[in-house]
Amino acid sequence: MNAGTAPPTSTAADRPLRADARRNRERVLAAADEAFALEGPGVPLDEIARRAGVGAGTVHRHFPTKEALLQAVLVGRLEGMLAEARAALAAADPVESFFGFFRIMTDYAQNKMDLAEALGRQGVDVRAVTHDVATALRRALDELLTRAQDAGAVRADITVDDLHALVVGTVAAVRASAPQDAVRVGALLSDALRPGKG
């Protein structure tokens, strides 16, 4: 290195968070996730800070805008769903693991879609924001589906794209139904995936 050349410096974004800062960020994300799930994405940042037990400045340091927090919660939910998919892949029974994960995916979608729709209304490219985790999730879902089809438990003509379309349709149907009908709607959908039901 030349004497007149300064060593490269890392930016704040490059440096790992201190343990206390990381804990605060996790508390904010947990509070936001719960608040958005219960009350929708309109909960203000100051209220998120109160529920997380941190100052408003702490929230703004980690998430300068409401949009940034919504994006982080959305990605976090997809990462949670990916972890569930990987756990299902590790299970011995390909049929139960597929249908169990499909129920989880439908439940997740009811909350995830609210955030995705809110971000879309703000002009955010949701597909770009979630690309990496969504790609990994699609691969895991494809493997779960293939295993269930090989076991003869799911129609051979069903694709991952079909599953996504069915989940979106199911969420819409559940939203339009009485709360007590949600389980029945989900059961009807699972039944439609089985051979001989199409």
What annotation goes with each model-predicted range?
Residues 40-41, 61, 155:
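Helix-turn-helix/winged-helix DNA-binding modules
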